[in-house]
Amino acid sequence: MQQKTKLFLQALKYSIPHLGKCMQKQHLNHYNFADHCYNRIKLKKYHLTKCLQNKPKISELARNIPSRSFSCKDLQPVKQENEKPLPENMDAFEKVRTKLETQPQEEYEIINVEVKHGGFVYYQEGCCLVRSKDEEADNDNYEVLFNLEELKLDQPFIDCIRVAPDEKYVAAKIRTEDSEASTCVIIKLSDQPVMEASFPNVSSFEWVKDEEDEDVLFYTFQRNLRCHDVYRATFGDNKRNERFYTEKDPSYFVFLYLTKDSRFLTINIMNKTTSEVWLIDGLSPWDPPVLIQKRIHGVLYYVEHRDDELYILTNVGEPTEFKLMRTAADTPAIMNWDLFFTMKRNTKVIDLDMFKDHCVLFLKHSNLLYVNVIGLADDSVRSLKLPPWACGFIMDTNSDPKNCPFQLCSPIRPPKYYTYKFAEGKLFEETGHEDPITKTSRVLRLEAKSKDGKLVPMTVFHKTDSEDLQKKPLLVHVYGAYGMDLKMNFRPERRVLVDDGWILAYCHVRGGGELGLQWHADGRLTKKLNGLADLEACIKTLHGQGFSQPSLTTLTAFSAGGVLAGALCNSNPELVRAVTLEAPFLDVLNTMMDTTLPLTLEELEEWGNPSSDEKHKNYIKRYCPYQNIKPQHYPSIHITAYENDERVPLKGIVSYTEKLKEAIAEHAKDTGEGYQTPNIILDIQPGGNHVIEDSHKKITAQIKFLYEELGLDSTSVFEDLKKYLKF
């Protein structure tokens, strides 16, 4: 099941349908695009995202996000007021951006939506959906199936492909860079392929074949940014399109996926704490679905299938962490579940994959990555500790029962291929050029003791030959929400910073998911301040152990990570010199008080219900960044916001910026002459949205800001980036 499991595990912690074998299988909350699974470096106008079979692994699924957009024209006066002109020495960064934009694509790690089915590979080439014979996939000998420009969209790209079992049809989900709306097109495959149908606002979708060899497409539909309806459709001479299921509870969302063996189509109904799964027989898709287990509050579960048995990843029982259970497919209810495999305490289940004779679990324990290979014939377990430099998995979809391929990466190291071969019982790594970063940098796993004594893990990177680390600049990363891990995928600009002498620190605070479900529970609702205490402890510990100093320390956060970063700026502004925030969630109270937003109900499990619970309201007031702005000294802050962001209210970011500038002005007035006012920059990107790809302009602007605020020479940055581009 591979990336689908990863999707599921993240979906359990945040609301809307996120990460997996394809964008639709992701489940995102209001304020986080998690991750899109992997870092995608956009070089031209097309998104190229690479997978290996008929279950592509890419980014997000249901965009069940409330639209809170404001026109660029309306915001222009505010933008002009809050933005400061770029410094004259911006030339070096302009060169960097120009170099990035003109660099040939082949010099980058490109990820492309690519699906193998039968003897063909289906993928995007330019602005077309194409296919080629498997052995010819690396050349230009391909067949054009559909031109995306027929949809008359601005810069369209494919983020998911599904091929019908007998290859009579292919379905592709298409969206644009500037919008989260998507269209699913159905292409009839023949000597002259033709678009037979298109459906708007499709989230997840899967093909099955019925008893009469007719292809049936099941798909979920979003209405008012909520994914509650399941449809099934047929094509050709027997066309029909009917609603199959509707979820009535607005706090739940629905998504679909096939078990890896394609035996069952699963309908997954879930919110942050509870799930329910129905099975549709892949051989009899018109039969009524079968319920696995009726939803029980607090019980989460995910289902896979092999040899007439269901394998269920669930948190039922004690401890309330994920464990693997098993039952016969014809007796699926919870009373029949037998414990099959248990994880150690404080272990995060990252992914799970089923093979003919093996089950493979990808885990994180003590801030290190492991692979556990379970022999299904004899219940044997082989645990492999992965290289200590690795911080993230990238799963390859794979139908080969003999091998389990995957990639490992870190923020400063591009993905490297590994394959576990079941017959040999060994892990093999890709041979070839060894990345020089392995010798020129160090990765450290440290811990900080929080206010209540809890040990908080940190991952730290720096150059091997760095001397006097106390005088080096430090960039601290934080997230701490929705049970999601802090993103540690490869980022070229992070590598550039390390090459230029920076220290990178990733603080895995409570509220995230690095140590399992309990780690998340200890940092949400009325325990949110634990995450803030953890962040403060991490920064103080780093300084205490000789890593940088407050005047050279910077902090960065994205989306919901802005809550803790913004709270730190209010509570301990002296710890950092500068902060960069991207699409930050900064006004928790007013957003959660607005019950007219379609997804507020889904967010209550994370932030609480301030509208009806006075305890929740008062607690949110204690840490909400917007509510706690006061006249005092603040670090300089660079905020990147997107005009068409459908997850974080742009109006709230503008209000936060205005209130912050007023507080700083009042403090400056009280302090008198000689006070150095911090720079507060609001960069509103027109035409973007919460899931927009990293643009070179944005990256260089953020790097420029950090260097300027710390008074550092930026000359070497361009040289380091040129070295990276030759990779």
Swiss-Prot record:
Positions annotated as active site in the UniProt record: S559, D645, H690
Record annotation: effect of changing H696A: No effect on catalytic activity
Compartment(s): Cytoplasm, Cytosol; Golgi apparatus, trans-Golgi network; Cytoplasm, Cytoskeleton; Golgi apparatus
Keyword Acetylation: yes
Signal peptide start and end residues: none
EC number(s) recorded for this UniProt protein: 3.4.21.-
Family: Belongs to the peptidase S9A family.
Assembly and binders: Homodimer. Interacts with the AP-1 complex.
Protein name per UniProt: Prolyl endopeptidase-like
Gene designation per UniProt: PREPL
